[in-house]
Design a protein with these regions (language model features):
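Short, solvent-exposed amphipathic alpha-helical segments in soluble enzyme
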Residues: 17-20, 69-74, 144-147
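C-terminal accessory domains and tails appended to enzymatic cores
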Residues: 100-186
């Protein structure tokens, strides 16, 4: 699996696109107590199916999370831009980025697939999501199995990662409907 166009998860300093699925909704996502971003949630889904992630293409803030901070230090990574702040980034030259991407793809495809680690999380799974706003929490509490941790955080337990993955998607869509209720009024 190649993950293309990814960004850091919520809260990474200097990140210009930090979010996890629902940029307006999710404040923190954890599986079995471990901080997760879109890259690791999706990599665990690939891992559930026995498929490794060989390449990630994304910004410097994600590179810090995956490589420097050790979330997935083995993965081949191509940095698309240097994130400077929430509203700014320094993009790399298109020609350089194209060449680095070609080289990374060739390196992964010419390598030994069987030596690539498969990103897995052991079952059973506890999904914990903290929302940006209370109304989002209220909508999420309508989901079967959702338990309140506090006024903005839910937990749902799963035995199967595919069900967890679908649960993340369902939560994202359901709480997205809450956004207009919490939007600033004029």
């Amino acid at each position: 699996v190649f993950l293309v166009g990814y960004h850091s998860g919520v809260g990474e300093a200097s990140a210009n696109m930090d979010h996890s699925y629902g940029g307006r909704t999710f404040h923190d996502v954890r599986i079995n107590g471990k901080y997760m971003n879109e890259s690791t949630i999706n990599s665990a889904y690939a891992g559930y199916h026995g498929v490794p992630v060989g390449l990630v293409i994304g910004d410097s803030a994600l590179q810090k999370q995956l490589i420097t901070d050790g979330m997935m230090p083995w993965v081949e990574f191509v940095k698309t831009k240097d994130s400077l702040s929430m509203m700014s980034a320094k993009f790399r030259p298109k020609g350089v980025l194209r060449q680095e991407t070609i080289e990374a793809v060739i390196k992964v495809l010419d390598g030994d697939y069987t030596s690539l680690p498969v990103y897995k999380i052991d079952a059973p799974y506890t999904l914990r999501i903290e929302f940006n706003m209370r109304t989002m929490f209220d909508f999420a509490m309508l989901l079967p199995g959702a338990k309140a941790v506090d006024g903005r955080t839910i937990e749902i337990h799963f035995d199967d990662y595919e069900e967890l993955f679908n649960g993340v998607m369902a939560v994202c869509y359901i709480v997205g409907m809450a956004y207009p209720f919490d939007a600033p009024r004029r």
